[in-house]
């Protein structure tokens, strides 16, 4: 039962990361000044 909780936690974390990636891409497309540095780093991450 404990293993299931770990799997659920990992799935939730992965979903959040994917969501963040989507938001980052949107911000980068709009060329928001605050995100420009993060976008430069984000280019190297597929």
Curated annotation (Swiss-Prot):
Its main location: membrane. GO terms for biological process: negative regulation of phosphorelay signal transduction system. It is a single-pass membrane protein. It is found in: Cell inner membrane. Disulfide bonds: none annotated. GO terms for cellular component: plasma membrane. The keyword Cell inner membrane applies. It holds the Pfam family MgrB. Keywords: Cell inner membrane, Cell membrane, Membrane, Transmembrane, Transmembrane helix. The chain crosses the membrane at residues 6-26. PhoP-regulated transcription is redox-sensitive, being activated when the periplasm becomes more reducing. MgrB acts between DsbA/DsbB and PhoP/PhoQ in this pathway. Represses PhoP/PhoQ signaling, possibly by binding to the periplasmic domain of PhoQ, altering its activity and that of downstream effector PhoP. HAMAP family: MgrB. May form homooligomers. Probably interacts with the periplasmic domain of PhoQ. Belongs to the MgrB family. This is PhoP/PhoQ regulator MgrB.
């Amino acid at each position: 039962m404990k293993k299931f909780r770990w799997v659920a936690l990992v799935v939730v974390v992965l979903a959040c990361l994917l969501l963040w990636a989507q938001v980052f891409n949107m911000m980068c497309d709009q060329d928001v000044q605050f995100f420009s540095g993060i976008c430069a780093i984000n280019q190297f991450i597929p």
